[in-house]
UniProtKB/Swiss-Prot annotation:
InterPro entries: AA_transpt_TM. GO terms for molecular function: active monoatomic ion transmembrane transporter activity; L-asparagine transmembrane transporter activity; L-asparagine:sodium symporter activity; L-glutamine transmembrane transporter activity; L-glutamine:sodium symporter activity. It holds the Pfam family Aa_trans. This is Sodium-coupled neutral amino acid transporter 7. The modification Phosphoserine is found at S28. Belongs to the amino acid/polyamine transporter 2 family. Symporter that selectively cotransports sodium ions and amino acids, such as L-glutamine and L-asparagine from the lysosome into the cytoplasm and may participates in mTORC1 activation. The transport activity requires an acidic lysosomal lumen. Keywords: Amino-acid transport, Cell projection, Ion transport, Lysosome, Membrane, Phosphoprotein, Sodium, Sodium transport, Transmembrane, Transmembrane helix, Transport. Its main location: membrane. GO terms for biological process: amino acid transmembrane transport; asparagine transport; glutamine transport; sodium ion transport. It comes from Rattus norvegicus. The chain crosses the membrane at residues 56-76, 82-102, 130-150, 179-199, 206-226, 240-260, 283-303, 320-340, 372-392, 396-416, 429-449. Interacts with the mTORC1 complex; this interaction mediates the recruitment of mTORC1 to the lysosome and its subsequent activation.
């Protein structure tokens, strides 16, 4: 077996325990990962975790499914219909699963337990910094999307409570979207975002799962038994151009991006073996694919090209079953925002402390003041942007490109570097095949990131 010599300059900027909580960064809300100490079991040790194989499947599905679900019917419309949407997702699934397996392999090789630590250890300091910056921007953008989703659902719920028809004008000031989003954010999200720890993670995850499955069920049921007043728009059967297909990529990448939280899940397993993990992620992605396809196909066929970027906005306000779905989504987002903010704040904190060369063991008062300041700046910026961005589609079009980096580029770079580090005089055909596949991942990821980001900037944001 080839020996592997992974880059070791990760330690130049500090160990994985700096920035207060780096070892817990971006782990799945259902997984408790204990920072490594000398003498602890490595990721390959059978006694290194407590999560069963079935439990790991559930956690990965939980990490994958989320708010991006609401945008999938619009993604099918953008891609050019059901056939194009299905083909795009099926083609992407191979790369999504392989990226998850690559990360597990590199986690074993580097003995690291979180996504960014694996990238640091395998690819070096520069790539590690870029990875952490990407995580910070991605979580920031996702928080903006969460606030927009809250506004979308509140608009419909308030319309029912005020007994106003959809699209009515001249509403009272206290029903204005900007006011309701701001009030909800200050009353609920900000207090939950300031604490150093977020002990409600597991409850929030369970709520998110219930809400996601309920939304999927409602969309499918409403397609099978539609309301009489609902009339679909044009049902596209083919994409307008090949570029239109790629415009659906951000939603798919955003929806299936669970790679950042996958490494802690892998290391939490009782038997964290790459072969077992391959079965786990394959089963999890098939389940997620079924949920996303069910929502995307049925939502698109119900409304056609007229579907809203947030599919729940396309349904009448007075529909009780859909109103329950909206309430589920609001509760889920209210608890998910602090979790994403916690992850982004930890990245920013780590980068800042390493840049300043400040030890973690500083006085508690300075840490508390800095945490409150970081939280307020993060919260106010995301709120301000959410108030003036009209729909989640525009946000997902931007952060979906970053999701492609986590799915394609960083796993591809890790695979290339891991294989290049092997001490073998004669390289077998499998070695060249894996290196070539790594190059393919990086190239494809760079193309998706560049194309979707450019399209988001010049078409969506500047339109």
């Amino acid at each position: 077996m080839a020996q592997v010599s992974i880059n070791s300059d990760y330690s130049e900027w500090g160990s994985s325990t700096d920035a207060g909580e780096r070892a817990r960064l971006l782990q799945s809300p259902c997984v408790d990962v204990v920072p490594k100490r000398e003498g602890e079991a490595s990721p390959g040790d059978p006694d290194s975790g407590t999560t069963s194989t079935l439990g790991a499947v559930f956690i990965v599905v939980n990490a994958c499914l989320g708010a991006g679900l609401l945008n999938f019917p619009a993604a099918f419309s953008t891609a050019g219909g059901v056939a194009a949407g299905i083909a795009l997702q099926m083609g992407m699934l191979v790369f999504i699963i392989s990226g998850l397996v690559i990360l597990a392999y590199c986690s074993q090789a580097s003995n690291e337990r979180t996504y960014q630590e694996v990238v640091w250890a395998v690819c070096g300091k520069l790539t590690g910094v870029l990875c952490e910056i990407a995580i910070a921007v991605y979580t920031f953008g996702t928080c903006i999307a969460f606030l927009i989703i809250i506004g979308d659902q509140q608009d419909k719920i308030i319309a029912v409570m005020a007994k106003e028809p959809d699209g009515a004008s001249g509403s009272p000031w206290y029903t204005d979207r900007k006011f309701t989003i701001s009030l909800t954010a200050f009353l609920f999200i900000l207090p939950l975002s300031i604490p150093k720890e977020i002990g409600f993670q597991k409850y929030a995850s369970s709520l998110s799962v219930v809400g996601t499955w309920y939304v999927t069920a409602i969309v499918i049921i409403k397609y099978i038994w539609p309301d009489k007043e609902m009339r679909p728009g044009d049902i596209l059967t083919r994409p307008a151009s090949w570029m239109a297909v790629f415009n659906a990529m951000p939603t798919i990448c955003f929806g299936f991006q669970c790679h950042v939280s996958s490494v802690p899940v892998f290391n939490s397993m009782r038997q964290p073996q790459v072969k077992t993990w391959g079965g786990v992620v394959t089963a999890a992605m098939v389940i997620a694919l079924a949920v996303y396809m069910g929502t995307g196909i049925c939502g698109f066929l119900t409304f056609g090209a007229a579907v809203d970027p947030d599919v729940l906005r396309s349904y009448p306000s007075e529909d009780v079953a859909v109103a329950v779905a909206r309430a589920f989504i609001i509760l889920s987002v209210l608890t998910s925002y602090p979790i994403l903010h916690f992850c982004g704040r930890a990245v920013v904190e780590g980068l800042w402390l390493r840049y300043k060369g400040t030890p973690v063991e500083e006085d508690v008062g300075r840490e508390r003041r800095r945490r409150v300041l970081q939280t307020l700046v993060w919260f106010l910026l995301t709120l301000l942007l959410a108030l003036f961005i009209p729909d989640i589609g525009k946000v997902i079009s931007v952060i979906g490109g970053l999701a492609a980096c986590f799915i394609f580029i960083f796993p591809g770079l890790c695979l290339i570097q891991a294989k290049l580090s092997e001490m073998e005089e004669v390289k077998p055909a499998s070695w060249w095949a894996l290196v070539s596949y790594g190059v393919l991942l990086v190239t494809l990821g760079a193309f998706i990131f560049g194309q979707t980001t450019a399209n988001a900037v010049f078409v969506d944001l500047l339109a």
